[in-house]
Amino acid sequence: MYCRLLLKLILRDKAAWICTLVLAAAFSVPIAFNSPIYGPFFMKQGMQGFVDAFNTRAPQASGTDLSPEQQADAELARYANAALAAQTDAAFLDSAESYYALMGEGFQSGSIVGDRETNDAALAYCRALSSSGITDIPASANDLPFLSFLPYAIATAPSFLPFIPFLLSSILVLGATRPATLAAKAPAPKFRRLIQIVFSIIAAGTAMLLAGLAPGGIYALALNGFGQIGYPIAFFHDGALTTTTAGNVFTALLLALLAGGTLISVCSAVLSTATRRVLAGPLTSALLVAAPAFPLLSDSALEHNAALNLLPLAVFSPIEATGYVGCFPTEFIGSGSGSASMLAVAL
């Protein structure tokens, strides 16, 4: 009865449909924009800016008349010009790697002041791409078949994690305490029934997540054709470079969401069962069911909560995702902790 009631409430409840539509929109909208979110675009912008600044201030003198700092700048400009003029991805990566390596030496010596972490990420990006054997670097999001929506999905899906089981559990409890259905008089279900409730919540939550992802996947499939599920990805985790594929990332993301939803769902079902017997009433039940999700609902917790460190990849906020996933991050999410990780080579 609980399982049938839950399914009926989900199908009839407007909140469930609204939640699914929001998920679908969040995962689908980014695909409609042919955004140049991949590393080479931003790297070339930075190099061009450096070359322009160097040409403006460079003295008209021979190499012997340059100071050590000016000689280093001239060397950087030479690598930057070579990268900008490169006709192949391999040539670009070779010159860019030399550029960022020399820039890194400047950060270490103190002769260059700026965002050292971003420079290190760019250097890691070049090295990882070179070692992965990629022969064609996508210039924009839609150049990567089928998976162009995946960077945004990785960035935003963890933010939706607390809301799905919270919504479904609340629907279950509020429905179970309505006078017209089970009301507060209903006895606590037996263990077998409790297990059915938990799995119903998990199944419904997973279905809603997949329903949210499906429109984006279908749209990307129609736009680009079925593409490179084995597209190589390299990322830093606990200070080590690890390689995987886009398909593995997508699978791991769904498993992580399912595991998190399961944990919250079990807590919610146990609490709701206890409160219906001891403190009957829809308001009390709903508040206690929501309790496991509260720590994850704050803005700061969504970005830095320890639970999100369980994900196999770095977690980026949606704002960073729109501009930097596919390139390299502007900061290390969770830096200073033992579980800090950073996406170095994007999709």
Please describe what each predicted stretch is.
Residues S28-R57, R127-G175, I195-T273, E320-F328, ...:
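Secretory targeting signals
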Residues M1-T20:
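Aromatic- and glycine-rich beta-strand/loop motifs that create alpha-glucan
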Residues V51-D143:
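Long, solvent-exposed extracytoplasmic domains/loops
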Residues I10-K14, P189, R276-V278:
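Short loop-to-helix capping motifs
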Residues T275-L310:
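Transmembrane helix segments
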Residues E303-C327:
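Short hydrophobic, aromatic-rich alpha-helical segments embedded in or entering the lipid bilayer
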Residues A16-A32:
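Hydrophobic membrane-insertion alpha-helices, especially the h-region
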Residues A183-F191:
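Short helix-to-coil transition segments within interhelical loops
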